UniProtKB/Swiss-Prot annotation:
Orotate binds at T118, R146. GO terms for molecular function: magnesium ion binding; orotate phosphoribosyltransferase activity. SUPFAM superfamilies: PRTase-like. It catalyses: orotidine 5'-phosphate + diphosphate = orotate + 5-phospho-alpha-D-ribose 1-diphosphate. It comes from Caldanaerobacter subterraneus subsp. tengcongensis (strain DSM 15242 / JCM 11007 / NBRC 100824 / MB4) (Thermoanaerobacter tengcongensis). The gene is pyrE. Belongs to the purine/pyrimidine phosphoribosyltransferase family. PyrE subfamily. This is Orotate phosphoribosyltransferase.
Length: 190
C-alpha cells in the first residue's frame, strides 16, 4: 500500500493526533498514532492485516502474537489471513506473559506484530517471552514504524508505513518547556 493511501486512511479515521503526548515508551511526542481507530472497522482491519501478512509471504509461520492491547486485533487478523493461531501477551506485574491458557510449543515459528513501533520495547519483551518458551521468532511486523531506523530486532522487521515523528526524552522535551499539558493516551499500566 502506498504511503499516501495509508495517510489518507489515517486522516479519514483520525488516527494521527497532535498535542503533547507521553508514549508507552516513556518518551514525549507532539504526535500520537491511535491505531485503535483502524481496528474499530473490520474492513480496515482486514486491509492492513492482509498487507502485513503479505510482507511475510513465503515464511513458514505457526503462530502470530502481539502485545496487549495494540497488538491483539492485529495479531488475530494477520493470523486469520495466514491461516494460523493468534495469541496475545499481557503485562502482569510489569512483565509480559501468556495467560488465558495460551501456549507456544517448542520449535513453533512465531511472527510478532504490533500496531505502532517507536522504541520497540513491547515487541522486544514479546520476543524474549516467545524465546523463553522455546518458540522461534521469524519476524516482526507493524502497521507504523516510527523508530527512524534505530531498531534491530535480530529478525526481519517489516512495516506498512514508516513515519518520521520526533520523540523526546522528558528532560529535553520542548513541549514540556512550553508548559503544554501532557496527555497519556496509551495502554501501558492499565
Amino acid at each position: 500500500m502506498e504511503k499516501e493511501k495509508v495517510l489518507e486512511i489515517f486522516e479519514k479515521l483520525e488516527v494521527i493526533n497532535k498535542g503533547h503526548f507521553l508514549l508507552s515508551s516513556g518518551k514525549h511526542s507532539d504526535t500520537y498514532l491511535q491505531c485503535a481507530k483502524i481496528f474499530q472497522y473490520p474492513n480496515y482491519s482486514e486491509i492492513f492485516s492482509r498487507e502485513l501478512a503479505e510482507k511475510f509471504k513465503g515464511y513458514r509461520i505457526d503462530v502470530v502474537i502481539g502485545p496487549a492491547i495494540g497488538g491483539i486485533i492485529l495479531a488475530y487478523e494477520v493470523a486469520r489471513q495466514i491461516g494460523v493461531r493468534a495469541l496475545f501477551a499481557e503485562r502482569e506485574d510489569n512483565v509480559m506473559k501468556l495467560r488465558r491458557g495460551f501456549e507456544i510449543s517448542k520449535g513453533e515459528r512465531v511472527l510478532v506484530v504490533e500496531d505502532v513501533v517507536t522504541t520497540g520495547g513491547s515487541v522486544k519483551e514479546v520476543i524474549e517471552l516467545v524465546r523463553s518458551l522455546g518458540g522461534e521468532v521469524i519476524g516482526v511486523g507493524t502497521i507504523v514504524d516510527r523508530s527512524d531506523g534505530k531498531i534491530d530486532f535480530g529478525v526481519p522487521f517489516e512495516s506498512i508505513v514508516k513515519l518520521q515523528i520526533k520523540t523526546y526524552e522528558k528532560e529535553e522535551c520542548p513541549l514540556c518547556k512550553e508548559g503544554i499539558p501532557l496527555v497519556k493516551p496509551g495502554s501501558r499500566k492499565l
